[in-house]
Design a protein with these regions (language model features):
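Small/polar-rich, solvent-exposed N-terminal microdomains that initiate assembly or binding
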Residues: 1-54, 72, 80
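Short, low-complexity, polar/charged sequence segments that are solvent-exposed and flexible
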Residues: 42-46, 57-61, 83-87, 115-116
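Oligomerization/assembly interface segments of phage tail-like spikes and tubes
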Residues: 56-70, 109-119
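An anionic, turn-rich surface loop/hairpin at beta-sheet edges
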Residues: 77
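Acidic-leaning, charged glycine-interspersed low-complexity segments
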Residues: 82-121
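Short C-terminal domain-edge/linker segments immediately following a structured domain
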Residues: 53-55, 68-74, 94-99
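Glycine-rich loops and low-complexity Gly/Arg-rich segments
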Residues: 48, 62-67, 88-92, 121
C-alpha cells in the first residue's frame, strides 16, 4: 500500500490552495478557529489488481472539507473548491461528489468534495 496521507499532504499544500486558505490539515479539529481552512480525510484505501496473490495497486479515496466565512475578504468555498479540484485533477484524481453543506452558523460556509484515484506499483 502507498502512503496516501503523504500523497494528499503534498497535493493539498500546493501554493494555489495555500495562497487562499490559512490552514490545511489532515484531521478534524474540535472547533475550527481559523478561516478559511481545508481539512482532508483518508476515506478509503483498498487493494486492486492482484498478481500472484499480491496487490499491484491501490484504489484511494479522500474527502476534502472546505470551511470559510461568508464575509468580505474571505475566499468562497467555490473559489477554493475550484483550486482544490484543479490540483487534484492534475494528480489524476476524479471528483465523484462536490456539494455545499448546510451549517448551523450563518456566517460559515462548508463544502465537501470526494476524490478517487487508482495507483499502481
Amino acid at each position: 500500500m502507498i502512503n496516501a496521507k503523504k500523497l494528499y499532504n503534498t497535493i493539498l499544500n500546493d501554493s494555489r490552495i495555500t495562497d487562499l486558505v490559512k490552514v490545511v490539515q489532515d484531521a478534524y479539529p474540535e472547533t475550527i478557529e481559523k478561516f478559511p481552512c481545508v481539512i482532508y480525510l483518508d476515506e478509503n484505501q483498498t487493494d486492486i489488481e492482484f498478481a500472484d496473490n499480491l496487490p499491484q495497486g491501490d484504489s484511494i479515496a479522500v474527502q476534502v472539507h472546505i470551511f470559510t466565512k461568508a464575509l468580505k475578504n474571505y475566499a468562497t468555498t467555490s473559489e477554493i473548491g475550484l483550486k482544490v479540484a484543479e490540483v487534484m485533477r492534475e494528480n489524476y484524481f476524479t471528483c465523484r461528489n462536490n456539494r455545499e453543506v448546510e451549517d448551523i452558523d450563518d456566517n460559515v460556509r462548508h463544502r465537501v468534495m470526494y476524490f478517487t484515484r487508482e495507483v499502481f506499483s
